[in-house]
Amino acid sequence: MGGIPTNYKAEVLTLNGSEKTVPGLMAIGEAACVSVHGANRLGSNSLIDLVVFGRAAAKRAAELVKPGTPHEEIPQSETDKCLERFDRLRNASGTNNTADLRLAMQKTMQSKCAVFRTEKTLKEGVNEIRKPFEGMDDLSVKDKSLIFNTDLVETLEFDNLIRQAITTMDSAYHRKESRGAHAREDFPKRNDEKFMQHTLSWCDGKKTKIDYIPCLLYTSPSPRDPNR
């Protein structure tokens, strides 16, 4: 199942080496992927992510965080980047409204990346899902206030959603097999030799990079392939 890759202690993993973590960064719940589920999570199994790994995260944080230790100062460049995004969207004065772009995104995902998928529909979806993203170049946010600005909130949410939609569409297109909730009519069987792996995706605007990381098939703390 999808999510931020973590180890069994809820620490976020990187690609640089076996089980190498990002210091100080943790993820739990449905935002995380600990590799304990199959390709289609069973009902109520989200409790594992919340209760089991929530407890594991708390225990690990208690081990790592020393009382009185100050937070590292956030670089000014990172703060400026967040503020630039906020101000750019709040002051957008184009012709496309967020609701129309969001509806276009929803229709594309429902028609091209639904339950049953094919090479043709996914390839069409890969192209179509980028149109709502490109529409943000001429976006309009009419409410410029800083108090209870639902127009801005919906726009910030859409900015996140459209990137996730692009990532999902591209990942589905490149996975040429059927597994769990991912059903390809043109590839009806699993391909364990090639795709017994989690999909990794980097999204930079409308461009994505796809890679893979092996699933954990044994009881932790069995590491992933050390050659990654």
Each PLM stretch: what is its role?
Residues M1-G2:
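Short loop/turn microsegments at loop-to-beta-strand junctions
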Residues P5-A27, A31-S220:
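Glycine- and aromatic-enriched mobile tails/lids
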Residues Y218-R228:
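Single conserved hydrophobic/aromatic residue that forms the stacking wall/gate
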